[in-house]
């Protein structure tokens, strides 16, 4: 009998997508499913991006430069300068989504068996890409009771071993929505300098900060050789399907190394770069309007969640995600039950089980991630559905 690889056996299922067959079956049965499980915004992709592609139809769809079109990278330099990130276009490698940026960063900076420290809960695909790269994720737990702030720095330092080569931070955070402040990032800078570590900084949601402003890890001059910035246009411009991201670093050795991986996959998507370059010409008020819409959705979601008996959800400071604690026995069972065995007014709701965002077994059992990417009317309807579901769920666990 043929066997699969050990690596394939270790690859985790996506907590965000693994319930998709159940949702599809629910829809075939006539239910409306409110998708709060995945960060796919319903806000329209800017028309200028689509028009740019239409206006650049070529009889031959060519490879681009392996690092990405120079014109796009040069315009990105101006974009980053607006965020107090001072770089040259040669400090940028365009990738096929932030996913490839994460994988290339792991492959270029860490060896098999090396360790990367990540506060949990964390974006589930970090673990998947660590498996692909043969590295080990070391988690440090944050808590819903304090809003998922950065774990105590001494707890992070206690996890450092001779195999530790990096710390990874997502700011604002997916899945919690927590916005790390400058003082928290300074503590991480101190650690990476003290122990000579890389700091992978996933900043894909920097435009969406509601409680304070975004501070980039790239603004630490002393640690500039240590910081690898991971970026994406997916959520910024509601263009997830374009699959375009970036790696940004002033460390030339890292750029030269990652460039070899970029050359091996030939080039990032041709038309995605044309669309993304056009997006950089959008007026500044594009983000003012978009941010205000997400903030309004956040406010509705958090108010509705915390109004449900025995539900608690801290107020996220950024991105468009929230982690909530529910009075349930098992989030995986509950999320499946919502799609298989429950409906309210011919609707149900799809959530992402919290366990999939933790590396520590048993953590997140009563938590779910919700993405507030639907309009407020749909969020209200989804919360009506969730409130009714919690009244009748067989595995409800009430506080004593």
Predicted regions and their residues:
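Short gly/ser-rich anion-binding loops that grip negatively charged ligand groups
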Residues: 39, 59-66
